[in-house]
UniProtKB/Swiss-Prot annotation:
Pfam families, alphabetized: tRNA-synt_2
SUPFAM superfamilies per the UniProt record, alphabetical: Class II aaRS and biotin synthetases
GO CC field: cytosol
Protein name: Elongation factor P--(R)-beta-lysine ligase
Enzyme class: ligase
The organism's taxonomic lineage, starting at the top: Bacteria, Pseudomonadati, Pseudomonadota, Gammaproteobacteria, Enterobacterales
GO biological process: lysyl-tRNA aminoacylation
Catalysed reactions listed for this entry: D-beta-lysine + L-lysyl-[protein] + ATP = N(6)-((3R)-3,6-diaminohexanoyl)-L-lysyl-[protein] + AMP + diphosphate + H(+)
Gene Ontology molecular function: acid-ammonia (or amide) ligase activity; ATP binding; lysine-tRNA ligase activity; tRNA binding
Length: 325
């Protein structure tokens, strides 16, 4: 603690006042649309299995748990919120803290604010329109552009991501200056993600938000596969001014398929030398009981506020970043 002013907030009080106004505006947006605000636990006995996500882990040893209970800070409120959907909540949203034991920097903090909402009986496109409405209201930006994952690659990299083989993907990576890295990578989806980050993200969403939809089925996560094209998933992401803002799905409702995906994730984790994670059987039971067809999205509030305030980094809009807490 060599910085004598390190007790001070990361953000200015003026920015924190503006942040509070944006939070109130978000709540009004959903209140006007009849969406219920909910609160769910920040900890769980299960966690995400995604090989690219790293949760914080703790252990409860209080009265009634002499043997101890392993708990994980939530990387997103998704699993609990889907249980509410299955219980008949109707449309819901949540503003909450989420935690990822990963990066810190200009656009990352291990503790961050998430806006997540779910719309029963919405398809992916209807939810995209609602996200666009929120962005226009908060950011005062132009209506977004939309393009498929395939269109994005064809437009900016002149390659079809749904049919290209690994050799062709490596050739494009070479042109982008990442040939050595690509040559060491055997996973096709990782190669696609590399090309997306290097060749697509910098080119989209410069003047207005960009929605990219229909990611490859192999990157479906918790999304349904498209009934029109089984090569792609009903998944979208939102980018604006070089920042990924949101990730949304038409939600998978088949518990058996979801279990298979969780188990496949854990096999990938084992192959990568990572610990396998406990599967959320409560979520699987909720899906089995009958979660309604829904679409949902998770949006990074700190990044949204950063864009709204034209700030340079997250520390300009967060009261205390991890280096000051």
């Amino acid at each position: 603690m060599s910085d004598t002013a390190s007790w001070q907030p990361s953000a200015s009080i003026a920015n924190l006042l503006k942040r509070a106004a944006i939070m109130a505006e978000i709540r009004r947006f959903f209140a006007d649309r009849g969406v219920l605000e909910v609160e769910t636990p920040a900890m769980s006995q299960a966690t995400v299995t995604d090989v690219h996500l790293f949760p914080f882990q703790t252990r409860f040893v209080g009265p009634g748990a002499a043997a101890g209970i392993d708990l994980y800070l939530m990387t997103s409120p998704e699993y609990h919120m889907k249980r509410l959907l299955a219980a008949g909540s109707g449309p819901i949203y949540q503003l909450c803290r989420s935690f990822r034991n990963e990066e810190m920097g200009r656009h990352h903090n291990p503790e961050f604010t998430m806006l997540e909402w779910y719309r029963p009986h919405y398809d992916m496109y209807r939810l995209i329109n609602e996200v666009d409405d929120l962005l226009q209201q908060v950011l005062e930006c132009a209506p977004a552009e939309t393009l498929s994952y395939q269109q994005a690659f064809q437009r900016h990299l002149e390659i079809d991501p749904l049919s290209a083989d690994k050799a062709q993907l490596r050739e494009v990576a070479q042109k982008l200056g990442a040939g050595d890295l690509a040559n060491r990578e055997e996973d096709r989806d990782t190669l696609l993600q590399l090309l997306f980050v290097l060749g697509v993200e910098p080119e989209i969403g410069k003047e207005k938000p960009a929605f990219v939809y229909h990611f490859p089925a192999t990157q479906a996560a918790l999304a349904e596969i498209s009934p029109e094209d089984h090569r792609v998933a009903e998944r979208f992401e939102v980018y604006f001014k070089g920042i990924e803002l949101a990730n949304g799905f038409r939600e998978l409702t088949d518990s058996r398929e979801q279990r298979q995906r969780f188990e496949q994730d854990n096999r990938k984790r084992a192959a990568a030398g990572l610990p396998q994670q406990p599967i959320d059987t409560y979520l699987l039971d909720a899906l089995s009981a009958g979660m309604p067809e829904s679409s949902g999205v998770a949006l990074g509030v700190d990044r949204l506020v950063m864009l709204a305030l034209k700030a340079e980094q997250l520390s300009d809009v967060i009261a205390f970043t991890v280096d000051r807490c």
